[in-house]
């Protein structure tokens, strides 16, 4: 959940061991997104940077406490994906 993620990230700011675990999880998630983005033809640094932007966008969305309905998120999903991936999917 977003609240759990935020709480763990706050904890990680104060505990190096927790920070190491959070970083490892973040790295795995970014690696998974990189593989996904590579399926759309991006390679190397471009795939990694697009994956990071996508991940940081989602983490930031939760960190800022954004609130919108699922309907609104689904409506905007194609726009987000075009901005993050670079073309319509």
Model-found features: residue ranges?
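Amphipathic alpha-helical packing segments from all-alpha helical-bundle domains
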Residues: 1-6, 16-41, 49-52
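Acidic, metal/ion-handling microdomains and their immediate structural contexts
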Residues: 12-13
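Hydrophobic/aromatic-rich alpha-helical bundle segments in the mid-to-C-terminal region
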Residues: 19, 39-89
